[in-house]
Amino acid sequence: MVSWMICRLVVLVFGMLCPAYASYKAVKTKNIREYVRWMMYWIVFALFMAAEIITDIFISWFPFYYEIKMAFVLWLLSPYTKGASLLYRKFVHPSLSRHEKEIDAYIVQAKERSYETVLSFGKRGLNIAASAAVQAATKSQGALAGRLRSFSMQDLRAIPDAPAPAYHDPLYLEDQVPHQRPPIGYRAGGLQDSDTEDECWSDTEAVPRAPARPREKPLIRSQSLRVVKRKPPVREGTSRSLKVRTRKKTVPSDMDS
């Protein structure tokens, strides 16, 4: 893991950033020699990046694989070894010059076929989307028609013909409260100066209810335990004879002196 991180850092800094800045300096100074040198480097480095994708998949387990890759990048970039120029002159340029016409023909065919393939794939995609939309629409219409057919006339007649519920506005509740209907036989005009109560009631008269008896207060516990003694009734026409007790005074006898 550590070797992989170091390898990626070396490839990024010494394989891309430094050559990119050197190419900028060559274009700015219009030095043809440096310009050709860095063009050869970028061609070789592009081939290296293409081969790296395959080698990372199959031979990344090889011992010292990342160390070898770092050394190869430094060898390509070094001005002393001039590895990029050497590989280009020995291998890349001769092979490209031999197969240049074939490569150009393949590129032209790829452009034409790519345009045709894009159009064909676009048409197929539109056809598939249109057929899917039509199938979805037909399925939904069939389900709706089956749902409507399931309702028979008896089911429709069985629906109660109830009136719509009245809406009560909370701001005007007093106007919407229904007034009490007068009792049967009562004249709508009410009592007047010349009318009496018997005239206001045409046929029947309300029977007055007996006044409710007041509920007796419950006895307190102390009162309920008391025994009320009642005096016997006094009969009329009788009188008691009152005996008057007289005290006899003892007269002291005169003592003979």
Curated annotation (Swiss-Prot):
One Gene Ontology biological process: mitotic nuclear membrane reassembly
Membrane-protein topology: Multi-pass membrane protein
Compartment(s) of residence: Endoplasmic reticulum membrane
GO CC entries: cytoplasmic microtubule; endoplasmic reticulum; endoplasmic reticulum membrane; endoplasmic reticulum tubular network
Keywords: Cell cycle, Cell division, Endoplasmic reticulum, Membrane, Microtubule, Mitosis, Phosphoprotein, Transmembrane, Transmembrane helix
Annotated stretches, region: Disordered: 178-257
Residues that bear Phosphothreonine: 196, 250
Source organism, top-level taxon: Eukaryota
Transmembrane segment boundaries: 1-21, 42-62
Keyword Transmembrane: yes
Modified residues (Phosphoserine): 152, 194, 202, 253
An MF annotation (GO) of this entry: microtubule binding
Pfam families attached to this UniProt entry: TB2_DP1_HVA22
InterPro entries: TB2_DP1_HVA22 (IPR004345)
Function (record text): Microtubule-binding protein required to ensure proper cell division and nuclear envelope reassembly by sequestering the endoplasmic reticulum away from chromosomes during mitosis. Probably acts by clearing the endoplasmic reticulum membrane from metaphase chromosomes.
Similarity comment: Belongs to the DP1 family.
Name this protein carries in UniProt: Receptor expression-enhancing protein 4
